[in-house]
Amino acid sequence: MATSQIAVIVLLGLLVATNIHITEAQLGVCYGMMGNNLPSHSEVIQLYKSRNIGRLRLYDPNQGALNALRGSNIEVILGLPNVDVKHIASGMEHARWWVQKNVKDFWPDVKIKYIAVGNEISPVTGTSSLTSFQVPALVNIYKAVGEAGLGNDIKVSTSVDMTLIGNSYPPSQGSFRNDVRWFTDPIVGFLRDTRAPLLVNIYPYFSYSGNPGQISLPYALFTAPNVVVQDGSRQYRNLFDAMLDSVYAAMERTGGGSVGIVVSECGWPSAGAFGATQDNAATYLRNLIQHAKEGSPRKPGPIETYIFAMFDENNKNPELEKHFGLFSPNKQPKYNLNFGVSERVWDISAETNSTASSLISEM
């Protein structure tokens, strides 16, 4: 067999292995826009494609971003922002209009996978005034998606944070706060009945920075050399798994044992507060990318995970919120991250076949 043919076969094998590797990871990146110096929407989507980032979270139905996503084959979590939740809950006509304008008009050119109705609405935060509208808005959007003929393609959910969890230690004893059960139980029931996952924002950084005396940095960064928490037969070496499994346990306690979880935000700031350093962020992100393929002790298997965020956003507050980006606004990577392909594979593909240029290079 000719050397060139062997090289092509080897390359194809590497490409197949690469695609499996990235699929296992199920990684996405959140596309926030709270900056006055960010690239154009088309540049951003091209950056996702060039880095082989196949999933994206969008916090509102920005028409420029949705148009840029046409034909990209990137899977999208499309946000219905908190400011619209009350309006959507007030009547089906509003839900139908929203779905037509922001979903149906872009389908199937834009691969919307989930609609996140609200972000971190909670009875115990500044969004408490919206809590009574959360489930009605979920139901109305769900019905509107079904009426649009997309009920088998798009799941409707909401994104929550860890403030709803009352007990998280040990993870098997995870439970929702008693004073929010009136809010969380109907959400879990809705997701169970519609077979949709709960979207959860999980930040080991905030748990660590708020309690460094009790939580070690290695445990938060996935670098603990030994088991930190023994929970029955389950062993925990990192805080991410412990937090994730506490939510699974909480849902099981409320009849949601069949409900999956998508980690809809997860990141580490590089500046602006205690523990927020370039080195810590790089370590956390590299390990998160690797760990997303593996699953947690309670739920082994790939974890669909969205890293927060694509860019540093200079209009956010407080200061540390400005420093969660994987990239600077000039599109230069802040970290040497790898979404599943080694530099060697990139070099081989570039030398052997120009059509492999879509392979991800190291970030």
Swiss-Prot record:
It holds the Pfam family Glyco_hydro_17. GO terms for biological process: carbohydrate metabolic process; defense response. Glycans are attached at N353. It is an enzyme of class 3 (hydrolase). The keyword S-adenosyl-L-methionine does not apply. GO terms for molecular function: glucan endo-1,3-beta-D-glucosidase activity. Keywords: Glycoprotein, Glycosidase, Hydrolase, Plant defense, Pyrrolidone carboxylic acid, Signal, Vacuole. Its EC number is 3.2.1.39. Induction: In leaves, in response to infection, elicitor, ethylene, or wounding. The gene is GLUB2. It comes from Solanum tuberosum. The modification Pyrrolidone carboxylic acid is found at Q26. Residues 341-363 form a propeptide. PROSITE patterns: GLYCOSYL_HYDROL_F17. It catalyses: Hydrolysis of (1->3)-beta-D-glucosidic linkages in (1->3)-beta-D-glucans. Is thought to be an important plant defense-related product against fungal pathogens. High levels in leaves. Appreciable amounts in stems, roots, and sepals. Tubers, root tips, and all other flower organs contain very low levels of enzyme. The active site is at E120 (proton donor), E265 (nucleophile). One of its GO terms (cellular component) is vacuole. This is Glucan endo-1,3-beta-glucosidase, basic isoform 2. It is found in: Vacuole. Residues 1-25 form the signal peptide. Belongs to the glycosyl hydrolase 17 family. InterPro entries: Glyco_hydro_17, Glyco_hydro_17_plant, Glycoside_hydrolase_SF.
